[in-house]
Amino acid sequence: MKENKPVDPYAKYNEQSNIIAKIIFASRWLQVPIYLGLIVTLAIYSYKFIKGLWELVINVNDMDSNTIMLGVLNLIDVVMIANLLVMVTIGGYEIFVSKLRTRNHPDQPEWMSHVNATVLKVKLSMSIIGISSIHMLQTFVNASNMPEKTMMWQLLLHLGFLVSAIALAYTDKILYSTSHKTH
């Protein structure tokens, strides 16, 4: 005798929903070209660093100490932007696309063992403040050649970065303490 199974009225809906969920989940791979583009950008900054260092070395005898300091600050700026690119590339890929699976690699940076969106946001904001600080140093070393209005706007922008980072850290602290309260 044939057994009557109840017909699931939502079976077709569940199947379509599952397909949509798979498409949405797979869409994260569309970010891969963006991260590869950041690697190309990192190569451009590596070239810029080598070129800047070479120019500093071959022209050192013709430079005064302020010009040398500006050249060094420019190199530090390039390094900090390169570090920012590495953090965004590795952290973003690991958080949003797929795990890198480098847990046992001897050269794995320490911060990768606990990378998450919150850690990445804090590291990014600190990097931006560091880059902004380098720009501020360059501005003040070269203050005699800078319009006062430009210096004021750079200072205000830097203060804005600082306030944003403090607000972000405070918000993360509140969220962390709220989510870890014992009842």
Swiss-Prot record:
Main location: membrane
Intracellular or extracellular location(s): Cell membrane
Transmembrane residue ranges: 30-50, 68-88, 124-144, 150-170
Keywords: Cell membrane, Membrane, Transmembrane, Transmembrane helix
Membrane topology: Multi-pass membrane protein
Alphabetical list of InterPro entries matching this protein: UPF0114, UPF0114_bac
UniProt keyword Manganese present: no
Listed GO CC annotations: plasma membrane
Coiled-coil region: none
Family recorded in the similarity comment: Belongs to the UPF0114 family.
Protein name: UPF0114 protein CGSHiEE_00455
